[in-house]
Amino acid sequence: MAAVPDRERALDLALAQIDKQFGKGSVMRLGERPVVQTAVVPTGSIALDVALGVGGLPRGRVIEVYGPESSGKTTVALHAVANAQRAGGIAAFVDAEHALDPEYARALGVDTDALLVSQPDTGEQALEIADMLVRSGALDIIIIDSVAALVPRAEIEGEMGDSHVGLQARLMSQALRKMTGVLSNTGTTAIFINQLREKIGVMFGSPETTTGGRALKFYASVRLDVRRIESLKDGTDVVGNRTRVKVVKNKVAAPFKQAEFDIMYGKGISREGSLIDVGVEQAIIRKSGAWYTYEGDQLGQGKEKAREFLRENPDVAAEIEKKILEKLGVGAGAGDATGGPELPPVDF
């Protein structure tokens, strides 16, 4: 075994050669690198921001949002777009399903005039456009809706009934190999919305699976399972859904946490409702019977009245949000799309 000084000298020579050939900083000691905050894009629900552990969706990463039809997947993605735009960011939406509703997006707070939208004809075209936009370095967030709608060119040009086994999976695998490094370097968040399918002949365990092969499961830093758990009614009219999101994979914090929040029809995620739920859970808001109080001041009788009070008093809502984040140790940077909690990212 070589003496320690000889090994150190050999390592220094190798590092110098690598720096010369590939550029300074190609290899570095982890301790030399300053601890960088995990920059995030808030989701619009404080319950989900807390469940993610860092105050929102991490920037520079691949995110997969999947679930049954009409569960709220696109709503979650559009709220992230709205929050990124509010912080001065540029957003793009690759609408492979050709189903984006501009009016609904506007109701959620999306600046539709500034939103870049593409409605590609083939899966190759969709992913090539996404790759070029990300490589520009100008994007903050990009949504691909959905993976299931990324149909390979060969399938579109072929006949009905033709077999195209594995084409979409290979397409996704190649695209993610190309995009992942660029996303990290540019700090762009890529949200892939995905659908569920049933595996035939499964006797034990869940028969559910997502489309597009295994590549997205591997490359995604965060995977969110979105489910509608109950309908919200005003008398006999259904006015929204109670939604549960499970963080099934998380590379920036502890996984397997759950969040529940309300999605109101035509309005999106109820930020105030989420604040009330988490505030009561953390004893920041007090619930006595049907009354909700905060620091001795009554918010209202019943959740709807309390929600209305917070909507009309955004400064009180912001104060409650700040206290919740501080109590749970989630950084103040969760309030914008450029900062994050002062915690080093943890890779599992």
UniProtKB/Swiss-Prot annotation:
Molecular functions per Gene Ontology: ATP binding; ATP hydrolysis activity; ATP-dependent DNA damage sensor activity; damaged DNA binding; single-stranded DNA binding
Nucleotide-binding keyword on record: yes
Chief location bin: cytoplasm
Alphabetical list of CDD domains matching this protein: RecA (cd00983)
GO cellular component: cytosol
Family: Belongs to the RecA family.
Protein's recorded name: Protein RecA
Originating gene: recA
